[in-house]
């Protein structure tokens, strides 16, 4: 990597963030596309967020990525939001357009890009969970023309989830159906009608647990996806594959959300196949 007086910076901002794989992805991409850039990880306190955002302009950076807990906190410091960032209410990418700071959320786009030969337009989706990742998938699905969405959360989270879905309906006219995850007969009924089943919860990170009971039967044509990539094969994915269904983990989402951000910053396509190779070797 060449560093000189013309090198432009990009960074991922979060707390904690030192474990992040984003520098690996983006620095590979800068190198492969002969872009004079460098990507670093900044672990900051909340009190430093305004100053950090000001530094994007000050140092003429490409921009930044954001992770927890700053995806929502950053919004007041930006000049403009993209449609999906406004719907989600969270930003994971800030682009410096000649001193104008524009907030995007590339998580949902990254998720749908990583699904092999699948488009969500006109399809039905069952989504488990309603946290940050789920919201980005929800909003992107609506923007991309999904026909029906059933969201399942634990019954204790129903009340907390409803206002966001009401706000989505207000902004888009699209009604999302909400159910309790404990209602197994409803879960089975919705899954049978679905083209896509997504686990957007953290259940399965321990390598032991699954968000759905094994007694659930999957329909003939369904794609199953998990946003988790460590472990590489969660019990949820193992269960789907045991029923002969195509199933993808969350590593592709991580790569393709980064590719979307890279294109917004540089105008260049990230060489995803090359980087995917390195990532799978690292995590498999």
From Swiss-Prot:
Domain of life assignment: Bacteria
E.C. numbers: 1.1.1.25
Catalytic activity: shikimate + NADP(+) = 3-dehydroshikimate + NADPH + H(+)
UniProt KW Oxidoreductase keyword: yes
Intrachain disulfide bonds: none
Active site: 71 (proton acceptor)
Entry keywords, A to Z: Amino-acid biosynthesis, Aromatic amino acid biosynthesis, NADP, Oxidoreductase
Chain sites annotated for binding NADP(+): 83, 129-133, 227, 250
GO process terms (BP): amino acid biosynthetic process; aromatic amino acid family biosynthetic process; chorismate biosynthetic process; shikimate metabolic process
Function: Involved in the biosynthesis of the chorismate, which leads to the biosynthesis of aromatic amino acids. Catalyzes the reversible NADPH linked reduction of 3-dehydroshikimate (DHSA) to yield shikimate (SA).
Family under the similarity heading: Belongs to the shikimate dehydrogenase family.
NCBIfam families the record matches: aroE, PRK00258.2-4
Record's protein name: Shikimate dehydrogenase (NADP(+))
Organism: Streptococcus pneumoniae (strain ATCC 700669 / Spain 23F-1)
């Amino acid at each position: 990597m060449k560093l000189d007086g013309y090198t432009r910076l990009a960074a991922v901002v979060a707390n904690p963030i030192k474990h992040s794989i984003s520098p690996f992805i983006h620095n590979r991409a800068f190198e492969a596309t002969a872009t004079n850039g460098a990507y670093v990880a900044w672990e900051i306190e909340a009190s430093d967020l305004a100053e950090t955002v000001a530094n994007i302009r000050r140092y003429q950076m490409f921009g930044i990525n954001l992770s927890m807990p700053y995806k929502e906190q950053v919004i007041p410091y930006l000049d403009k939001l993209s449609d999906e960032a406004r719907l989600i209410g969270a930003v994971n990418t800030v682009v410096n357009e000649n001193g104008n700071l524009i907030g995007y959320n590339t998580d949902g786009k990254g998720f749908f890009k990583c699904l092999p030969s699948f488009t969500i337009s006109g399809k039905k989706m069952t989504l488990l969970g309603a946290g940050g990742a789920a919201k980005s998938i929800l909003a992107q699905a609506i923007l991309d023309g999904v026909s029906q969405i059933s969201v399942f959360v634990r019954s204790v989270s129903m009340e907390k989830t409803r206002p966001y879905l009401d706000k989505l309906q207000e902004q888009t006219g699209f009604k999302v159906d909400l159910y309790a995850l404990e209602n197994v007969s409803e879960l089975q009924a919705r899954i049978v009608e679905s083209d896509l089943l997504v686990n957007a919860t953290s259940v399965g990170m321990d390598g032991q647990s699954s968000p759905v009971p094994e007694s659930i039967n999957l329909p003939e044509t369904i794609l199953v996806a998990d946003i988790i990539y460590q472990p590489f094969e969660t019990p949820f994915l193992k269960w789907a594959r045991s029923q002969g269904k195509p199933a993808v983990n969350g590593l592709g989402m991580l790569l393709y959300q980064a590719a979307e951000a890279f294109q917004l910053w540089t105008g260049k396509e990230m060489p995803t196949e090359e980087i995917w190779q390195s990532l799978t070797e690292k995590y498999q």
